[in-house]
């Protein structure tokens, strides 16, 4: 049966596709679109694929229904016989692969139900698979056997040493032997090589199977099916798998290695639609897609759809290109032809090879593995071919040819070809990897991507991809300038919005200036009437509305920051202007920083790296907000003096001595903790300084803030007499701070006795006069309210049973009389007419 020849009439006549070429052979172009060309030898076209309806002889794969012979892979349902792989349901006799139900006798494949006797094929079902698939012309050529017979004989001819010719060995035994035994060392190579003889593209059919198999399947097919599903095709693709199309061992390995390097089965065959081979590049798109590539009956074109070219007809062009390439020893074309072979197209590409040198491509591939030089020479073509095989799954049925064409015609599009082969439906990752490595030394990375990038997904290449994200500048130009028209005309008008950055040297102007509302400007320009009597520098702390706490920042605006140049200009303008007419609420004016002091401040900050001191500098520059106490402390001590003191810098400033003494004081009270010792020292230093001096004022302000909690009230109350004396001798501003401190103490019943002593009450009552500031009077009234609340609550009796209310009661009565008189005086001042009438 192995030697039996299939009659030309027995071969099914696939429909002739437009552009399909008929190869010189026993079959005519019209009758058999897949013509076998005696390209190489009469060896069985193991691994050949029928174009569409053609049945595959050993190593041939039917596109859809054909059964697989040994070395051929059934699509899905075929059962594996010795050396054969069942597609799914069909049972295969050794060397044969049934697609569905048909059983193949040795070397013969039935399309559907028909059973093929080895070497014999039903006319309709057994299309000259040899011819259609691989252009079995090689087989008939070598043996003089009809192409049909050549195809029929098993793949067993592999290097097992029994290279059966079309008539040689029985299909069954050969196939079985080939799968199990003949290919032990070189799984794919031996079985397929017999086809075209050593060095030839014998593997073309076998490795060309469109449907990729699970690696398990690989084992069955005459060694072509490597464990990784390299099968003829797979072996070709798998790393060192034997020749893809029953090539000579070296050549086969070369190709397979070449591809296997990066792709296990880069384009061995797509499992589903994508399996179409580029090889089927006959003029008819349908042939190329249906015949052998798509065992499932899908168009090979999808698989091979070139990413760049998606024209179905391309493959015809490609075929020509491939042929040229094969002749020029381009592995790519060879691959395309070898694995894409639809009947005629396979022949055509083989023909070209035969004409030029069918073995050339195979050798080239084999040599490539062996010889890196060859690999470099042919890499692009081969990659292109590979791309066709894996890249385009389900794109166009007619693309099978197109993909092939791309591979051939565009050696530069290596990644395209490789992408296609590696990309296929389920085996994309494995397919792409093998093909790329060898084919493209330059674009190896590009080729490889196809194999690993998409898992079970179609490749989709966009020539003009949109960026995933738009890159935008993260930083604004520091040198960006504001338009002169948008700049504030006066300092009262606007301040620049705070922008974090260096606090000296280079300032960062705000790019979004904002104008202060008119109400705010009016308040900045003129203080309310009721603030006229306020002590200097304490206007914001006025108690005009005792029920509402004063805001931390005027108008609740964020701190503003100006550049160094702007601050210099502003300070010079303030010095040149009259102090009475100058009104500004900026931090520099609040801290009373002069031009000379500001320059010293900048010099210090250039030399200092202490983070704590930098925080102070940020406050002075307006870059950082600060509490009122902190601002007052910096203002009273002087920003430069404060920094020098903290750094132990020598300074000639008089006011620095206070800070030095305060910071470097000796703890005279061993029984007190550090903070308590510090508070006692501050009280002593404050009272020791001259009245109304800056050092004294600074100490009082510090104590005022320390009395916000009751923890230190008792300590400070010990110095009550000294602070009460200041209420009689100090100016309005010093009185204000002393009264604010005493107001905090008045809330604590524990110190009420000392605070409201007879001496204290007389001093408080003496403050009710027309000459005293309204703020100070308001504070005294608030103090009496606090003590009144303490007495009413009964807390006073619990703390001190000896506390006498008589002095307080008399003080309250006197206080009421003074309050009425004071109110009358104020009313008379506000309404002169009423004063005259009275």
Curated annotation (Swiss-Prot):
Q: InterPro entries recorded for this chain?
A: ARM-like, ARM-rpt_dom, ARM-type_fold, GASP1-3
One Gene Ontology MF term: amyloid-beta binding
Disordered: annotated segments? 1-122, 218-292, 349-368, 531-552
Compositionally biased residues, Polar residues:
220-245, 542-552
Q: Which GO terms describe its cellular component?
A: cytoplasm; cytosol; nucleus
The family line of this record is: Belongs to the GPRASP family.
**What is the species of this protein?**
Homo sapiens (Human)
Q: What does this protein do?
A: May play a role in regulation of a variety of G-protein coupled receptors.
| Any single biological process term in GO | hematopoietic stem cell homeostasis
Gene of this entry: GPRASP2
Key word Ion transport present: no
Assembly = Interacts with cytoplasmic tails of a variety of G-protein coupled receptors such as muscarinic acetylcholine receptor M1/CHRM1 and calcitonin receptor/CALCR.
Q: Which keywords belong to this entry?
A: Deafness, Disease variant, Phosphoprotein
| Tissue/organ expression | Expressed in the brain.
Q: List all Basic residues biased stretches.
A: 255-271
Disease named in the record = Deafness, X-linked, 7: A congenital form of bilateral mixed or conductive hearing loss, which is progressive in some patients. Additional clinical features include ear anomalies and facial dysmorphism with bilateral ptosis.
Please identify the protein, giving its name as recorded. Answer: G-protein coupled receptor-associated sorting protein 2
**Signal peptide (from-to):** none
Tell me which residues bear Phosphoserine: 282, 284
Spell out the Basic and acidic residues composition-biased ranges.
13-31
Q: Which PANTHER family match?
A: G-PROTEIN COUPLED RECEPTOR-ASSOCIATED SORTING PROTEIN 2, PROTEIN BHLHB9-RELATED
């Amino acid at each position: 049966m192995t030697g039996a020849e299939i009659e030309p009439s027995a071969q099914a006549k696939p429909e002739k596709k437009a552009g399909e070429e008929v190869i010189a052979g026993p079959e005519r172009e019209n009758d058999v679109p897949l013509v076998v060309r005696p390209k190489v030898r009469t060896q069985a076209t193991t691994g050949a694929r029928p174009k569409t309806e053609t049945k595959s002889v050993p190593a041939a794969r039917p596109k859809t229904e054909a059964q697989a012979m040994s070395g051929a892979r059934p699509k899905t349902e075929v059962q594996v016989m010795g050396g054969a792989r069942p597609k799914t349901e069909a049972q295969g006799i050794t060397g044969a692969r049934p697609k569905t139900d048909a059983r193949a006798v040795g070397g013969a494949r039935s399309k559907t139900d028909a059973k093929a006797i080895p070497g014999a094929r039903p006319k309709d079902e057994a299309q000259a698979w040899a011819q259609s698939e691989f252009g079995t012309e090689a087989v008939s050529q070598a043996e003089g056997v009809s192409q049909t017979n050549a195809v029929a004989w098993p793949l067993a001819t592999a290097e097992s040493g029994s290279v059966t010719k079309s008539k040689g060995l029985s299909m069954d035994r050969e196939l079985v032997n080939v799968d199990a035994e003949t290919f032990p060392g070189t799984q794919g190579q031996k079985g397929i090589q017999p086809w075209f003889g050593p060095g030839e593209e014998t593997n073309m059919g076998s490795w060309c199977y469109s449907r990729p198999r699970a690696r398990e399947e690989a084992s069955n097919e005459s060694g072509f099916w490597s464990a990784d599903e390299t099968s003829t095709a797979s072996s070709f693709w798998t790393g060192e798998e034997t020749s893809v199309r029953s090539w000579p061992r070296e050549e086969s390995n070369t190709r397979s290695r070449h591809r296997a390097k990066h792709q296990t089965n880069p384009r061995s065959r797509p499992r589903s639609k994508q399996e179409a081979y580029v090889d089927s590049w006959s003029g008819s798109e349908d042939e190329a897609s249906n015949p052998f590539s798509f065992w499932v009956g899908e168009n090979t074109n999808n698989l091979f759809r070139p990413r760049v070219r998606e024209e179905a007809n391309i493959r015809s062009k490609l075929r020509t290109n491939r042929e040229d390439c094969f002749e020029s020893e381009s592995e790519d074309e060879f691959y395309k032809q070898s694995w894409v072979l639809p009947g005629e197209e396979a022949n055509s590409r083989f023909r070209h090879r035969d004409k030029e040198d069918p073995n050339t491509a195979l050798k080239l591939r084999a040599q490539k593995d062996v010889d890196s030089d060859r690999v470099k020479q042919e890499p692009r073509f081969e990659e292109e071919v590979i791309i066709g095989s894996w890249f385009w799954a389900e794109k166009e049925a007619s693309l099978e040819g197109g993909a092939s064409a791309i591979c051939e015609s565009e050696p530069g599009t290596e990644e395209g070809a490789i992408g296609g082969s590696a990309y296929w439906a389920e085996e994309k990752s494995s397919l792409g990897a093998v093909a790329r490595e060898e084919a493209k030394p330059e674009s190896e990375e590009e080729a490889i991507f196809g194999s690993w990038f998409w898992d079970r997904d179609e490749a989709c290449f966009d020539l003009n991809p949109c960026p995933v994200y738009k890159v935008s500048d993260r930083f604004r130009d520091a040198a960006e300038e504001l338009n002169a028209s948008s700049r504030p005309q006066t300092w009262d008008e606007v301040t620049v919005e705070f922008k974090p950055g260096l606090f000296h040297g280079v300032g960062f102007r705000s790019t979004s200036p904002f104008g202060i509302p008119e109400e705010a400007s009016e308040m900045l320009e003129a203080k309310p009437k009721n603030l006229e009597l306020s002590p200097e520098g304490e206007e914001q702390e006025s108690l005009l509305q005792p029920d509402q706490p004063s805001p931390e920042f005027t108008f609740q605006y964020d701190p503003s920051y100006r550049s160094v140049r702007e601050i210099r200009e502003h300070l010079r303008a303030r010095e040149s202007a009259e102090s009475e007419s100058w009104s500004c609420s900026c931090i520099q004016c609040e801290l009373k920083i002069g031009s000379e002091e500001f320059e010293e401040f900048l010099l210090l900050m250039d030399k200092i790296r202490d983070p704590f001191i930098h925080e102070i500098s940020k406050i002075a520059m307006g870059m950082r907000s600060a509490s009122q106490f902190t601002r007052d402390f910096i203002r009273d001590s002087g920003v430069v003096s404060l920094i020098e003191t903290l750094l132990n810098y020598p300074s000639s400033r008089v006011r620095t001595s206070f800070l030095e003494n305060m910071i470097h004081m000796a703890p005279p009270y061993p029984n007190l903790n550090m903070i308590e010792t510090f508070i006692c020292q501050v009280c002593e230093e404050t009272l020791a300084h001259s009245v109304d001096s800056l050092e004294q004022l600074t100490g009082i302000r510090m104590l005022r803030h320390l009395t916000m909690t009751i923890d230190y009230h008792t300590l400070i109350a010990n110095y009550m007499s000294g602070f009460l004396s200041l209420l009689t001798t100090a100016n309005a501003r010093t009185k204000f701070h002393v009264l604010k401190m005493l107001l905090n103490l008045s809330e604590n019943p524990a110190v009420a006795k000392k605070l409201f002593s007879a001496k204290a009450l007389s001093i408080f009552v003496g403050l009710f006069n027309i000459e005293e500031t309204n703020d100070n009077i308001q504070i005294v009234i608030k103090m009496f309210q606090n003590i009144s609340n303490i007495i009413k609550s009964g807390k006073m009796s619990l703390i001190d049973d000896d506390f006498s209310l008589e002095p307080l009661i008399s003080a309250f009565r006197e206080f009421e009389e003074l309050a009425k008189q004071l109110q009358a005086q104020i009313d008379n001042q506000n309404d002169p007419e009423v004063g005259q009438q009275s």
